[in-house]
């Protein structure tokens, strides 16, 4: 390959579309199972330039005849350029992460900064915190020792103001994993998570619940790719390209998730929105029926509402971990907080309101069999829809194209506002 990424496991990587967007060259992923395979790859040198990800950012350093100052200071290389068989190593993670933190409102100067994780990214974050003028830099790991706190010890530091996650905790396919409970730090001001898949980890979700700046690693990824691409090609790329590519990629990855009462038009408008966006449409209730091998009324009859809700949660977790979908939820999907968290991790949630007179009664809907049942349901669920949603639109019952327009506008506005 000419350009690409090497690492042990790359199924989570978004690097190819980023580099192809930034540099206009083909970018390939090459998984190397161990350091023996890494050594053979470096020996052959059959590449022009590559990026390096975990766990090889330190292992590649001896092969580099030149190391830039950032790589030397941090002790990690994420970019290698092959110039006539001579390898030069660079660290562009530093510049990418520092820019992402600054633009995301993560202020380090004069703060007590806690870094989660003890791998290579920790060195990058430590260097940034130091250069930004942090008052104190703490590092926490699972085992502690040698200047590293355990997570339990870190929890007792009530003065922590900024948390930087340098670990892979919460990264796909381990969605939902989280190392800490942010509620133990009353002075907390902001959180940065190097993880970008999913876009909203449980760590970031906690921060957003407190109204704090919460930044994922996607802007860092695009930023370091921009600086790496400059080394690859020798061409200067304006910093504005980082923001453009970040917006483009986010628009492709983010799910559009529709919530609302039964009969509000989620399925019909969702299909139209999916067609307009050129992406797949998924109806959660249909997925539940497919997995169960029976209809929703039959599930309620045989397993009760509890059984149905358990199935719904499993489907929400599966779909929420995917990207680039339009998802129509069942009317009761918001009844469980874990469903909302699962759907928000990669999704913009839009609440579709509709007047009570226009909502459907009966049919394939066991819990809305009458007007009275529907009124009670709306009173109970409306606050949950509002709390779950990033945006609200009203479906007037007019031409479906108008509702589709409003839903798509809400989706784009939410992304522009930085909800993910």
Predicted regions and their residues:
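Phosphate/diphosphate ligand-binding glycine-rich loop within oxidoreductases
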Residues: 2-104, 198-200, 204-206, 210-213, ...
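Glycine-rich adenosine-cofactor-binding loop
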Residues: 7, 89-94, 101, 106, ...
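Adenosine-phosphate binding glycine-rich loop
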Residues: 31, 194-254, 396
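NAD(P)-binding Rossmann-fold cofactor-contacting core
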Residues: 132-148, 285-287, 291-292
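Rossmann-like adenosine-cofactor binding region
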Residues: 147-215, 333-339
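NTP-dependent small-molecule kinase module
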Residues: 243-251, 272, 276, 348, ...
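ATP-dependent small-molecule kinase phosphotransfer cores
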Residues: 286-344
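A glycine- and Lys/Arg-enriched "phosphate-lid" helix/loop adjacent to the NTP-binding pocket
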Residues: 345-384
């Amino acid at each position: 390959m000419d350009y690409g990424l090497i690492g042990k496991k790359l199924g989570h990587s978004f690097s190819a579309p980023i580099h192809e967007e930034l540099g206009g060259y083909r970018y390939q992923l090459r998984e190397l199972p161990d350091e023996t395979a890494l050594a053979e790859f470096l020996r052959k040198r059959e590449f022009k330039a590559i990026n390096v990800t975990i766990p090889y950012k330190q292992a590649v350093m001896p092969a580099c005849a030149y190391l830039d100052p950032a790589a030397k200071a941090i002790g990690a290389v994420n970019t290698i350029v092959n110039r006539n068989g001579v390898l030069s190593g660079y660290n562009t993670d530093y510049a990418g992460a520092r820019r992402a933190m600054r633009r995301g409102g993560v202020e380090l100067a004069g703060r007590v900064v806690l870094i989660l994780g003890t791998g290579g990214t920790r060195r990058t974050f430590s260097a940034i915190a130091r250069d930004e003028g942090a008052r104190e830099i703490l590092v926490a790991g699972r085992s502690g020792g040698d200047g590293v706190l355990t997570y339990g010890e870190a929890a007792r530091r009530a003065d922590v103001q900024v948390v930087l996650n340098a670990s892979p905790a919460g990264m796909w396919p381990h969605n939902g994993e989280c190392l800490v409970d942010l509620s133990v730090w009353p002075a907390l001001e902001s959180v940065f998570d190097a993880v970008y898949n999913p876009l909203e980890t449980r760590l970031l979700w906690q921060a957003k619940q407190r109204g704090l700046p919460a930044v994922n690693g996607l802007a860092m990824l695009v930023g370091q790719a921009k600086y790496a691409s400059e080394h690859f090609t020798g061409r200067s790329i304006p910093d504005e390209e980082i923001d453009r590519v970040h917006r483009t990629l986010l628009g492709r990855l983010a799910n559009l998730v529709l919530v609302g009462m039964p009969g509000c038009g989620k399925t019909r408008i969702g299909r139209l929105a999916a067609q307009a966006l050129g992406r797949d449409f998924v109806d959660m209730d249909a997925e539940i029926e497919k997995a169960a091998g029976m209809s929703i009324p039959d599930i309620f009859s045989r397993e009760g509402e509890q059984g149905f809700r358990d199935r719904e949660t499993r489907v929400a977790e599966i779909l929420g971990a995917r990207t680039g979908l339009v998802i129509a939820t069942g009317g009761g999907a918001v009844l469980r907080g874990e469903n909302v968290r699962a759907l928000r991790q990669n999704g913009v949630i839009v609440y579709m309101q509709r007047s009570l007179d226009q909502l459907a009664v009966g049919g394939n809907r066991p819990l809305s069999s009458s007007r009275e049942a529907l009124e009670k349901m709306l009173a109970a669920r409306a606050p949950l829809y509002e709390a779950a949603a990033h945006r609200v639109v009203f479906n007037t019952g007019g031409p479906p194209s108008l509702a589709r327009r409003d839903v798509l506008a809400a989706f784009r506005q939410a992304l522009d506002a930085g909800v993910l």
